[in-house]
């Protein structure tokens, strides 16, 4: 009985904690400060600038082209000199872009995977064609590869002529286009995990198999992007090509940009606009095709 009384006294002496209804506290996520304004304003500003810089000039070309009668349009683009100019631009731009794809990828590989004296200098020199005026590049290349030039004089002794030939056009397009491939492939190679290559080597794969099965699928979309940019740039290139091609209709070294300029000089605006539209459509189809190939490659890699 005494024990029961002591127990009751302890219970009465113990303070009772009265818990009220639990409050549901919602933690609001702290908003990170935005460097740019909201989506609506940003999108509006971006579309406005894009319209002024890109869409409006392209729309102007389309508007002028639609005003040309179909018969006059076909007559402007069906001339032999125009066909030869398009054939020259397409073939030389494609060959130059293919060369840039191969050697640009090799150059990016060397700059990323190896450390050697002068690597930073070479990496900076790659962007020189972006900063150098194309006319200056064309004059320099024409002097260098002329019959009295440093390289041209040696090549002439071997029976090889560079200036005023399609080979000279390709060299000029390689010069202006190689930065596109290098700068497209270089970041992908830098982020590529080397453990996959080590795993392939441990499993007994040779270097060619490792490159074909592991490295190539990863860098292929970036390489195609650089190829497309170099190809599209080569189609409309003027300054670096005009001094080394010779612009001979007989030798078929006239490019599309030169023929367009000639038509503008002779006040043939319909002919120039028609050629500009065809060139614009070709460049768009090339870029669209490469983008679709990149998307397909990315989906294939994502489904592995």
Residue ranges and their predicted role:
Residues 33-34, 95-126, 139, 143, ...:
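Transmembrane-helix boundary motif in ABC transporter permease subunits
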Residues 29-34, 70-78, 83, 118-119, ...:
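Membrane-interfacial helix termini and adjacent extracytoplasmic/periplasmic loops
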């Amino acid at each position: 009985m005494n024990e029961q009384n002591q127990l009751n006294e302890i219970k009465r002496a113990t303070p009772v904690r009265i818990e009220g209804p639990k409050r549901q506290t919602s933690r609001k996520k702290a908003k990170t400060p935005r460097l740019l304004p909201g989506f609506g304003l940003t999108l509006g500003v971006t579309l406005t600038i894009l319209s002024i810089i890109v869409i409006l000039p392209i729309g102007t070309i389309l508007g002028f082209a639609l005003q040309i009668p179909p018969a006059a349009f076909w007559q402007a683009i069906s001339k032999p000199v125009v066909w030869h100019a398009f054939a020259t631009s397409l073939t030389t731009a494609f060959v130059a872009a293919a060369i840039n794809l191969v050697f640009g990828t090799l150059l990016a590989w060397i700059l990323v995977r190896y450390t050697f004296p002068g690597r930073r200098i070479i990496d900076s020199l790659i962007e020189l064609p972006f900063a150098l005026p194309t006319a200056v590049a064309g004059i320099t290349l024409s002097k260098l590869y002329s019959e009295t030039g440093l390289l041209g004089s040696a090549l002439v002794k071997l029976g090889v002529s560079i200036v005023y030939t399609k080979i000279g056009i390709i060299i000029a397009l390689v010069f202006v286009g190689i930065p596109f491939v290098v700068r497209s492939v270089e970041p992908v190679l830098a982020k590529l995990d080397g453990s996959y290559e080590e795993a392939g080597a441990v499993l007994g794969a040779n270097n060619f198999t490792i490159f074909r099965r592991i490295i190539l699928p990863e860098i292929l979309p970036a390489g195609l992007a650089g190829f497309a940019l170099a190809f599209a740039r080569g189609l409309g290139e003027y300054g670096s090509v005009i001094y080394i091609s010779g612009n001979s209709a007989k030798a078929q070294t006239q490019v599309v940009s030169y023929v367009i300029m000639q038509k503008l000089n002779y006040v043939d605006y319909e002919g120039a606009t028609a050629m500009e539209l065809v060139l614009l459509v070709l460049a768009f189809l090339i870029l669209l095709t490469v983008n679709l190939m990149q998307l397909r490659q990315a989906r294939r890699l994502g489904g592995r």
